[in-house]
């Protein structure tokens, strides 16, 4: 039985969907993100529009509703770098390939923007996420940073992007 799902780029009008998925993510894994439930629930529609505007967001849709999201944002000082952020997949779809589809979309977007590297941060000790990103071709860089809001250590990971023609899955091994 195949899962009916699609990953699509978020557009104006998707603010309430992004908000709903982001709040689910923060309820499910409050320590995994740089923000808090309290901060995100207070965001207005205009805040969500601004959140989408400097980069890109993708939503994973299934018949049961939105089940995941991810965002990509160009680095402010280095145009060759795109940051993968706000990655989350609903617990019921983990291990089914949905998270892979979200990451592949950010990689494809980064490639189309001319980026050479996709970079992310993962909380130290979140081995499931780290292993997932390693499977997607990311490697730790040795850079670590203490998150100010709670003292958690964030480990930086990145992967280079091959600019050859073809789909983003072709270079998943890094």
Q: Which residues are covered by each model-predicted region?
A:
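Acetyl-CoA-dependent GNAT
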Residues: 9-92, 103-105, 109, 144-146, ...
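Conserved phosphate-binding and hydrolysis motifs of nucleotide-dependent enzymes
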Residues: 68, 97-99, 137
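C-terminal "cap" of GNAT-fold acetyltransferases
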Residues: 116-117, 123-130, 134-174
